[in-house]
Amino acid sequence: MESPLTPSAQPAPMPSLVAATGPSTPEIPPEVSQIARFAKLDDLLALGRANSLWPLTFGLACCAIEMMAAGMARFDISRFGAEVFRPSPRQADVMIVAGTVNKKMAPAVKLLYDQMLEPKWVIAMGQCAISGGPFKYPGQYAVVEGVDQLFPVDVYVPGCPPRPEALIEGILKLEEKITGKRRFPVAQLKE
C-alpha cells in the first residue's frame, strides 16, 4: 500500500525556532509569521490591564461630581476601558482620589489603598488631592497636602474641579504608562 504522502506532498521539515545566537532570541520562520502574531506575555498582560481598568471611586468633594459625570452617557468613560466603578478595593485596580483628604480620613484612605491587589494605580484628581488646594495655607492643621504623602500617585489630573474630559485624559495617560504607547495619539501642533 502506498503512503498517502508522496515525496512531493510531504511537508518540509520545520525550521528551528532557535536562532544561532542562543535560546533567548527566537527566530520566527516567514511562513509562520504570515499567519500568526507574536508578542511578549508582559506586553499582552499590560494591554489587557490597560483596556480593562476597574476604578475605585473615592469622591471626597466637588471633584467627585465631575468624576460621576465622566461615567454618564455624555462622556461615557467605559469607551476608554474604565467600565464600571467598583465599590470595593478588592475588586479595583485604579484608585481615583477626587477631593480633599483631611488628616483624620488619611488612615482610611491608606487602608483602602493597601487592600487593593497588585498591580494597582492611583489617579489624584483635582488640586485638593494633588496639593491640598485652597485649604493649603500657613498654619492649617487638618488637610493632607497631597495624597502622594500617603501612597505613590501615577497620574495627576489638575483643576478645581477638573472637567470630565480631563479625567478621561488622565485615564489615557495611565493606559500609556501601563502599555508604553498611546491609544489615541494627540495631534502635534505646528509652531
UniProtKB/Swiss-Prot annotation:
Annotated localization: Cell inner membrane
Pfam families (UniProt xref): Oxidored_q6
Catalytic activity: a quinone + NADH + 5 H(+)(in) = a quinol + NAD(+) + 4 H(+)(out)
Enzyme class: translocase
InterPro entries for the chain: NADH_UbQ_OxRdtase-like_20kDa, NADH_UQ_OxRdtase_20Kd_su
Region listing for Disordered, in residue ranges: 1-25
Membrane topology: Peripheral membrane protein
Binding residues annotated for [4Fe-4S] cluster, in chain numbering: 62-63, 128, 160
Cofactor note: Binds 1 [4Fe-4S] cluster.
GO molecular-function term, one example from the UniProt record: iron ion binding
GO biological process, alphabetically ordered: aerobic respiration; electron transport coupled proton transport
GO CC terms of this entry: plasma membrane; respiratory chain complex I
UniProtKB keywords: 4Fe-4S, Cell inner membrane, Cell membrane, Iron, Iron-sulfur, Membrane, Metal-binding, NAD, Quinone, Translocase, Transport, Ubiquinone
Cofactor(s) of this protein: [4Fe-4S] cluster
EC number: 7.1.1.-
Role played: NDH-1 shuttles electrons from NADH, via FMN and iron-sulfur (Fe-S) centers, to quinones in the respiratory chain. The immediate electron acceptor for the enzyme in this species is believed to be ubiquinone. Couples the redox reaction to proton translocation (for every two electrons transferred, four hydrogen ions are translocated across the cytoplasmic membrane), and thus conserves the redox energy in a proton gradient.
Subunit structure comment from the entry: NDH-1 is composed of 14 different subunits. Subunits NuoB, C, D, E, F, and G constitute the peripheral sector of the complex.
Recorded family membership: Belongs to the complex I 20 kDa subunit family.
Name of this protein: NADH-quinone oxidoreductase subunit B 2
Organism of derivation: Opitutus terrae (strain DSM 11246 / JCM 15787 / PB90-1)
Designated gene of the protein: nuoB2
